A protein has these predicted regions:
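N-terminal intrinsically disordered, acidic low-complexity segments at the extreme N-terminus
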Residues: 1-37
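N-terminal Sec-pathway targeting helices
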Residues: 40-55
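Hydrophobic single-pass membrane-insertion segments
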Residues: 63-76
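Extended, compositionally biased repeat/scaffold regions that form elongated interaction surfaces
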Residues: 74-362, 376, 380, 386-390, ...
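Boundary regions of SH3-family modules and the immediately adjacent low-complexity/disordered segments
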Residues: 346-350, 397-427
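Penicillin-recognizing serine hydrolase domain
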Residues: 425-459, 463, 518-666
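Active-site SXXK
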Residues: 460, 470-494, 507, 635
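Short, well-structured active-site flanking segments
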Residues: 487-505, 525-527, 573-576
C-alpha cells in the first residue's frame, strides 16, 4: 500500500468515526432515534415455514388483519414475510426490562457437541459463522428439542410441542415457531431470539462492553415512527441509494417507507460465505435503522454500526477494516445474550421420552455424581423419567435404562444424549456391568492387563472393557493372515491351489507357525499387514520387529475382523465359507478359552494365541464366533503381563463361560 493511499484510508476512517461520534452526541440514548441514513425493511420479518404451517396459519392470520406475503426462494426454504397488524410487533408496547443473570459464565465453560438432530442444518448454513459454538446441549422445551448457540438457537419441533400462546418464563413461547426460519429439508426451526431479548428488554450492552445500545434501545428503535421515507418514481423492494440499500416496507404515491442497510452492513450480510441462502433467508428483513455506538473491544474503544434484523443482529466495526476495505462485520451473540439474561433455561421433560447416548457415559446416582449404576455407550437407549437439573452450566437428566437381564435408573449428562434415534442397523454399546456386574468387577480386578469385547449379534449389542488397548496378538493374528491372503488371491481372480490350501489349513487348524511365516512373507511382512488393516478399516495395529506373533492389536480390532468375516463384508461368499470352515475345525488341543467353555450344543469358529511377550511374561488370548441355537455372539478376551500361564488361561475361561451362560440362558 502506498503512503498516499494509507493517508486517504486513515482520513476516511477518521471521518467515519467522527460521524459516529456526532451521531452519538446528537442522540443521547444512542439510538432511541436512529440516524436518518442507514438501512433496510423492518416489519417484513423473514419466517421460514413449511407448506403445512403456512396453511395452518394463513386463515387465522387473515382473520386477524395480518398481511402475509410469500416470496419464492431456492432450496428447501419457504419464506413468509409478515407485517403485524397496525405495524406493531409483539414487543411494541412492552416496557419490561431484565438485568443480566450472574450465572452465564458457567455456560461458557462447557464443551457441548452439536446435537445430531441439528448437524446437517448447521453444516449447510455455515453454522460456525452464523450460529457459533454450542453453549448448551440439546434440551426439551415446550417448543421441542432446543439447542442454544453463541449467536442463536435451533429447535426440532416434536409432536408434543406445546401450542400454548402463554409466554413461557424463558421467553420460548410457541409463536417463535411461526416467526422463526423453517427448513423443510431438515424440519429445523432457527428461532428469532432477538424477539425474546426485545420482549424481555435485556439491558445487556449490544456490541461490546460500555456500548450505549442495549436491547431496550433496539426495542425502541423498531417503533414504526422510525421508518425512513424515500421518494421513488417507481417504488421497488430494494433500491440502491448514496447511503446503501433502501428496502421498502410499503409504498404510496411515490413515497416508500422502509429502512436503509448501510453499504458496510450490506457487504457483510450479502457475503455468500456468511449467508449461503441469501441475506433475507439468513438474517430476515431489518427491524431498525443502523444505530451508532461505541464499545470496548479488546481493551480499546471502537465505533460500531449496529442493525437489528428479524433473525440476527449485525455489527460492523468502523475502526477495523477487512481485506475488502470494508469494516469487519459480525453476527452478535444472541444466544449468549439470551443465556446471560435468563441464566439456565427452563427444561420441559415429558416422562417416558426416548433418547439415546452419543458416546460412553456413566449413569450416576446424582447429577454430577461419581457413583455409577452402569456404564453405557453409543446408541444405548434411555427413557427420561421427568426430572432434569442444571449443575454448573451442565444439564442432567434423570433416566431409566434396561439391558438384557438388568435395569436401573440414574442421571445422564444431557451433553451425551440425543433425540435422534440411531441409524438402522447401528449397534448399541455398553460396559460389562450392563450385562453382569460380577463379570465387570472381575475384569476390572486385572486393570489394564485384560481387555475384552463381546458382540451379541442376536440383539445387536456390544459389551466392552479396555477394548481399545493394544495387546500382543500371538497366534490370533493368523485369522488376519488368512483373510488378507484370501483377499490377495481374490485380487488375482482365483482361490487357493492345493499347496496354498495345505498352508492355510496348517496355519489355522494346527496353528503351524512355519505356515504362518510363509503367508506373512508372501504378503509383504509387517507392511503388508498394516496395509490390510487399513484397507478393511481396522485401526490400532502396531508392527513389531520380532514378527507377526509379537505385533499388537486392540480387542476391538480383532472383533472387527471377525465381524467382517462373519457378516460377509470382507470376502466372497465362497471364501468366507472356506475361512469359517477352517476355524470350525481347530485341533482339540487348540480348544482353549472360548473353545472349552461353550454353552451346551454350541459350535465355534475360533483362534487362540499364547506367547511369552518381549517382557518375558505371558500374552494369552482367545477369540471366536459362537453359535448356540438361535443365539450368536462373537467374543474376544486378551491378556498381557501374566506371570502364570495357567492363571492367564483361567481368565479367558472365566469370562467366556460367564458370557456364554448370560447370552444363551433365559
Amino acid at each position: 500500500m502506498s503512503s498516499d493511499n494509507a493517508t486517504d484510508n486513515a482520513t476516511d476512517n477518521a471521518t467515519r468515526a467522527d460521524q459516529v461520534v456526532q451521531a452519538d452526541q446528537a442522540v443521547p440514548e444512542a439510538i432511541l432515534t436512529p440516524p436518518p441514513s442507514p438501512e433496510t425493511p423492518r416489519n417484513r420479518r423473514a419466517v421460514l415455514v413449511s407448506v403445512l404451517v403456512i396453511v395452518a396459519l394463513l386463515v387465522p392470520a387473515l382473520a386477524g388483519g395480518v398481511l402475509w406475503r410469500v416470496k419464492n426462494v431456492p432450496s428447501s426454504l419457504v419464506v413468509v414475510h409478515r407485517t403485524p397488524q397496525g405495524g406493531a410487533f409483539p414487543w411494541s408496547n412492552v416496557t419490561r426490562t431484565t438485568a443480566p443473570s450472574p450465572q452465564y459464565a458457567i455456560f461458557a465453560q462447557q464443551n457441548n457437541p452439536i446435537d445430531p438432530a441439528f448437524q446437517a442444518y448447521y453444516t449447510r448454513v455455515n453454522g460456525a459463522v452464523l450460529l457459533g459454538a454450542a453453549l448448551t446441549p440439546a434440551y426439551l422445551t415446550q417448543l421441542g428439542w432446543t439447542q442454544v448457540f453463541a449467536n442463536g438457537a435451533l429447535v426440532a419441533p416434536t409432536q408434543s410441542s406445546s401450542s400454548s400462546s402463554q409466554q413461557a418464563a424463558d421467553g420460548l413461547d410457541s409463536s417463535l415457531l411461526h416467526s422463526g426460519q423453517f427448513d423443510s429439508a431438515t424440519g429445523i426451526v432457527r428461532l428469532p431470539l432477538l424477539d425474546v431479548l426485545l420482549t424481555l428488554g435485556s439491558t445487556i450492552p449490544v456490541g461490546g462492553d460500555d456500548s450505549s445500545v442495549t436491547y431496550v434501545s433496539l426495542r425502541a428503535a423498531t417503533d414504526p415512527s422510525h421508518l425512513a421515507h424515500l421518494q421513488l418514481a417507481q417504488p421497488t423492494e430494494t433500491t440502491e441509494t448514496a447511503d446503501g440499500i433502501f428496502v421498502s416496507e410499503s409504498a404510496s404515491h411515490g413515497t416508500a417507507a422502509g429502512h436503509t442497510i448501510p453499504t458496510s452492513i450490506w457487504t457483510y450480510v450479502t457475503n455468500s460465505t456468511i449467508a449461503p441462502d441469501g441475506w433475507q433467508d439468513t438474517f430476515g428483513n431489518p427491524l431498525t435503522e443502523a444505530l451508532t455506538t461505541t464499545a470496548t473491544i479488546n481493551g480499546a474503544s471502537h465505533h460500531l454500526l449496529v442493525q437489528a434484523f428479524a433473525l440476527a443482529t449485525v455489527a460492523v466495526d468502523l475502526d477495523d477494516d477487512g481485506d475488502d476495505g470494508q469494516p469487519t462485520g459480525s453476527v452478535l451473540p444472541l444466544g449468549r445474550d439470551y443465556l446471560e439474561t435468563l441464566g439456565p433455561p427452563t427444561v420441559v421433560v415429558p416422562t417416558g421420552t426416548n433418547v439415546w447416548l452419543t458416546s460412553n457415559a456413566a449413569i450416576v446416582d446424582t447429577p454430577g455424581g461419581s457413583v455409577a449404576s452402569v456404564h453405557l455407550g453409543q446408541n444405548s437407549p434411555l427413557a427420561l423419567s421427568g426430572q432434569s437439573q442444571w449443575l454448573s452450566g451442565a444439564l442432567w437428566y434423570a433416566t431409566n435404562w434396561k439391558s438384557l437381564k438388568l435395569s436401573g435408573s440414574g442421571w445422564a449428562p444431557a451433553s451425551q444424549v440425543t433425540m435422534t434415534s440411531p441409524a438402522k442397523g447401528a449397534a448399541a454399546w455398553a460396559g460389562f456391568d450392563a450385562l453382569s456386574p460380577d463379570v465387570a468387577k472381575y475384569l476390572a480386578s486385572f486393570g489394564k492387563n485384560v481387555g475384552s469385547v463381546v458382540f451379541d449379534m442376536t440383539r445387536n449389542q456390544y459389551y466392552s472393557y479396555n477394548e481399545t488397548t493394544p495387546f500382543v496378538l500371538a497366534s490370533s493374528s493368523k485369522v488376519s493372515l488368512m483373510v488378507s491372503y484370501l483377499l490377495w488371491l481374490e485380487s488375482q481372480g482365483r482361490g487357493p491351489n492345493a499347496s496354498e490350501n495345505g498352508t492355510l489349513t496348517n496355519m489355522i487348524e494346527h496353528s503351524d507357525n512355519n505356515a504362518a511365516q510363509l503367508i506373512f512373507d508372501r504378503l509383504g511382512g509387517s507392511s503388508g499387514q498394516t496395509a490390510f488393516y487399513k484397507k478393511i478399516g481396522v485401526t490400532g495395529y502396531i508392527e513389531n520387529s520380532y514378527g507377526w506373533g509379537w505385533a499388537s492389536l486392540p480387542p476391538l480390532g480383532q472383533m472387527q475382523v471377525l465381524t467382517l468375516l462373519q457378516e460377509g463384508k470382507v470376502l466372497t461368499a465362497h471364501d468366507r465359507a472356506y475361512a469359517l470352515n477352517l476355524m470350525n475345525h481347530i485341533e482339540a488341543d487348540q480348544h482353549m478359552g472360548v473353545g472349552e467353555t461353550l454353552p451346551p450344543g454350541a459350535t465355534v469358529a475360533m483362534k487362540d494365541g499364547w506367547v511369552p511377550a518381549p517382557d518375558g511374561l505371558w500374552a494369552i488370548n482367545t477369540s471366536g464366533i459362537v453359535t448356540a441355537g438361535n443365539e450368536m455372539y462373537i467374543i474376544v478376551v486378551y491378556t498381557a503381563h501374566q506371570s502364570d500361564y495357567e492363571g492367564a488361561w483361567n481368565i479367558t475361561r472365566h469370562v467366556c463361560k460367564a458370557v456364554g451362560q448370560l447370552l444363551t440362558t433365559p
